[in-house]
């Protein structure tokens, strides 16, 4: 009985420490050097397109750097072996994936399946995602939706390569936010850097890739049938319901709450105290630097710092001038 109570107390102590993670850098044909030059994330090449900041997906597992007792563990292993840190969740796999993307060139025009299609055909979750635009070069744009009224019209426009008749292009600037549910035709344009919050899935169906070739000189695969299967017809309108809370000179802006996750920006000027009531919270610094105070202990936060506030953390204080994107599963 005494040993059980001691074990429980130790777990309570561990739960009040943030879990910091090392990102996994992914080389992409469309990637560049901004992750290295602007975020200090040096990868294996000059075409690093993605930093998987918080990930338990088998294609790129983030590694815990602190606290010391978990250092070196993959997030997937931590989630499986210490479910108490995550509120003993019902999800078998860690449900979210947080990325920073540097699009030096256009990404392919693509779409992702929902859970039902993804599990049946790919053996993994579908992929609903959303984007916060960290930076955008002048004239930058994205593909966000399509103009076809039916599957037949969609397939006809794709087959004839009438991309301007099919695709909806939207100009973007820093601070924009986009909800990208599964079934949405989309592509990030050249010169755009985003933070992406998504379901933990790596399934993408390409519709158009600008006739690019891979490093072996082969055309990149397209997935036209699967894309047509999962795309919305006609493309629905999407409206954000943004909630802004002013806290002194700081702001808390909730951009999105859906069946998979809630995404919020913490804009810190000098100091911001936050109360947390969800099972656990993910956060990544996208601008500035400062400190995280938790139970009287300060933790340095720098650009691209990514961490999880585990179950049991009910209040934090952020100090400095910095911006973070936070999220938690539904």
Kindly give the residue locations of the regions a language model identified.
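Conserved hydrophobic/aromatic beta-strand scaffold that supports enzyme active sites
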Residues: 100, 108-110, 130-132, 169, ...
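Short, structured beta-strand/loop micro-motifs enriched in basic residues and often containing a Trp
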Residues: 156-164, 289-291
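An exposed, glycine/acidic-rich loop-and-rim segment of catalytic or binding clefts
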Residues: 160-166, 177-179, 185-239
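Ligand-binding loop in jelly-roll beta-barrel domains
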Residues: 93, 101-106, 115, 125, ...
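Transition-metal
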Residues: 1-149, 209-238, 263
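Acidic/His-leaning functional-site neighborhoods
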Residues: 241-299, 303-305
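Short acidic-glycine-tyrosine-enriched beta hairpin
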Residues: 166-179, 294-313
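Short beta-strand/loop turn elements enriched in aromatics
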Residues: 132-154, 252-255, 268-279
